[in-house]
Structures are given as C-alpha cells and as structure tokens.
Amino acid sequence: MKLNKWLTSTKFIVSLYIGVIILLIFFLYKIVVYENFEDTIVVSNLDSSAGFYSMFFFTLNHYIYCKRNKIGFRIKSDNWLFKSSIGWTDYFEPVELTFHNNPTNEQSALHSTVLGDYPIRDYQMVIKNLYKYNANTKNEILNAYSKLNLVKGNYDSIFIRRGDKLGKESVIIPEENYMDALLEKNPRCKTIYLQTDDYTCYLNLVKYIKQNNLGVVIHTLCDENSVGVVVHGFQKDILNDASINNDANKDYLSSIIQKLNDTKPVEDMNSVEKYKHTMDMIVGIDLVIHSNICITDYQSNVSRFIKLAHDHPKNVYNIDDLNNDIDYDKIICPSYSF
C-alpha cells in the first residue's frame, strides 16, 4: 500500500517536473526567436483557414508585438483565401516594419497564433496602420458614396451578418429589433445604410418601415439573390444540420437552406469572383464605419472590427446590451470575442 502511494506520488512529481520543463523551453524559445535576434522578421501568414477579419485581428496582434519589441514585420498572403491576383495589396497598401538592416531569420506567425497579450484598445489604436486602402479600393468606395448619395456622418447604419454564421456561431435576431434600437438611440434617424450578406434582412426592414410609417430611407449594396455568405464548403454540412436541430435558427434556415446549398463558397470562387466579393465587403464596411450611429451585434469578427474601426466607437451599439460599452482594457484578441 505504501509502495503504491510512493509510486503515485513519484509519478505526479515527475509529470509536474516534465511539464514545467516543457513550458520553460517554450517560453525560452519565444524569447530567443522573437526577442534576442536583431536579424529576425516576423511574417504574418494570411492563409485560407478563416474569414477575413478573424485573420486580420491575429495579424494586428503580430504587428503590435513587433512594433513594441522592435522586430521586423511583413505580411505574406500568397495563399490567402481572399487573394485575387497578388494578395493583400489587391485591396490595401503594403505593410512592413523595419528596425534592422537585412534581417535573415524569418519566423512565421499563423492564424490563431498570439505573440503577446494586449488589451482591446491596443488593437484599436493600430488598425489604421494596416487597414490602408490602395487607389483602386479608394475609388470603389467613392463610387459607392456617390451612387447612394451618402455623406459621411450624415446617416446611420445597421450591420447584420448571417449565412454560415447561423450554423452554430450566431443566433438570429429579428430585423425590427435593430430598427427599434436605432430609433431609440437616434429618434431623428431618416437615412440608414444596411450592410448585410442576406438580402432578406433588407426586405424585412423595408416592410417594417412601411408598416410603421417610420419615414426612413434605407439603402443596401447587398445582392438581391444573396441569402448569406458561406466561406468554406464544409460549413454547408453544419448549416444543413442546424436547419433541423438548431432550435434558435432552424425555422429560418429551413426556409433558405436550398439557396445556401447553392451558394458558392468563397474558397471555390475564381480570382474575379473573389475580388468582387472582397471589394464589395470592404466598401460596405467602410460605409458602416463612417456612419453616425451603428446598431449591430458582436457575434462576428466583422461587427467587432466595425466597433473598433468606427469614427465614433461609442456610437456603435450592441443590440444585446445597448446601455453598456465594451471594456477596452480587457486583455483578449478581438478575434475570440470582446
């Protein structure tokens, strides 16, 4: 009996000792790789594993880390899901940090790799350092403002993301809830831009506005045939299951599931289709972040990006909690949540 206790105790101590050694090696590895080498450059890899703004938040993390520690930084987007021709510079200006001449030690940082733990406000402060439109993107954005006759700050906005998010990440919120919340925050609202991937949201809001004589004009750039974006093909299996078993979303999903099944995933689009899809998204998001007041939810990376990138972040409201702002001092990568 005593022997068994001794063996158990010894095994526990040995396991604990090994665990400490592994953690120490990992910690020292990070120090050696990223902090002690003046010739190191961190390469933030944009790949095909996740959505646009999920990857963007992790790239922001890599950028913050490099900027603080004076380490070289650049973006690699050869295999990026949203690459049309070149990659990042299809839509944005190139981004690079250089602190030392001719760095030779490249260290790759992938999606979901967190190099340092930072508060949300740190991410907010550097968004504009990376999110810099190239000339073509600027022109597309100007054309959109002209087409819709919108002036920055003189209209309100609503953002609703559906599509593949309804499989398991998001819960359907009735469109009228967003409208009511917006009118609560701005009773004088007369013009709204709706950014959504599901045209049904637009139709339902138009109907609600007419039925209640709200006297509000609503615009959208959403394709009238779209019932939601599907990023990866495997998400269709999740959506089909949710259309039967997801109590919160199944009623709506079951009514559009065939259209979702017919929707081409972003990963299967050709270069022309990817460019249009991505440019339309960037343009629409720009219209939102330069609105007066925005009502959204924080269930998606896009909406969390909108909160942080908006001209007046305090004017971006979470439909689930209109009276409380986020904690900007919370240490978390926004790709996970607020």
What are these regions (language model features)?
Residues T191-I319:
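Donor-binding and catalytic core of enzymes assembling or modifying cell-surface/extracellular glycoconjugates
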Residues M1-V43, L150-V151, C333-F338:
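Intrinsically disordered, compositionally biased terminal peptides
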